[in-house]
Amino acid sequence: MDTQEEQRLIQQAKEGNDEAFTALFHYHYSFLYKYLLKLSLHPDLSEELVQETFLKGYIHLRSFQGRSKFSTWLISIASRLYLDHQKKRKREWKRNQTVTEETIRKIKWDVSAKGAEWSETLDLFSKLDPKLRTPVLLRHYYGYTYAEIGVMLQIKEGTVKSRVHKGLQQIRKEWDDE
């Protein structure tokens, strides 16, 4: 889908055309799901958050002003939903600070079953705290600028830089320890 087509669909969706929003949903679904899966490492949670993201996007579509790409706007919503989810689960998260080996094995199996490869880097990445994992993923996998990430996560640019630095530092430390 080219930019003009996307802009046309966004405008039609803003005017109440549900078919246009459905087309946007289908176009961006896979991208958003993969982003959330990398972020959460939980397929069911990723699916749930994609649905919530599109619901919020649908409800607040009129507030999309086109200052950024539509996909950036969706990632911003998805990131905030994910971080909100993590805050709600903070007590439980503290008890289970790292992803269990069983969950990682399941994800590795799922990834390899689809013909992809689970690397040592993903192992180390999966152990990062979500506050660090999110900015590292947005910066180094998706290529967003620190400023864009700050807007998406509603944190200061300096905070983004320090979280990316700290996340990479932790990965390097683990790498050196092995």
From Swiss-Prot:
It comes from the Bacteria. GO terms for molecular function: DNA binding; sigma factor activity. InterPro entries: RNA_pol_sigma-70-like, RNA_pol_sigma-70_dom, RNA_pol_sigma70_ECF_CS, RNA_pol_sigma70_r2, RNA_pol_sigma70_r4_t2, RNA_pol_sigma_r2, RNA_pol_sigma_r3/r4-like, WH-like_DNA-bd_sf. The keyword Transcription applies. Residues 146-165 bind DNA. Keywords: DNA-binding, Sigma factor, Transcription, Transcription regulation. It holds the Pfam family Sigma70_r4_2. The keyword DNA-binding applies. GO terms for biological process: DNA-templated transcription initiation; regulation of DNA-templated transcription; response to stress. NCBIfam families: PRK09638.1, sigma70-ECF. Negatively regulated by both YxlD and YxlE. Sigma factors are initiation factors that promote the attachment of RNA polymerase to specific initiation sites and are then released. Positively regulates the expression of the sigY-yxlCDEFG operon upon nitrogen starvation. Also positively regulates ybgB. Belongs to the sigma-70 factor family. ECF subfamily. This is RNA polymerase sigma factor SigY.
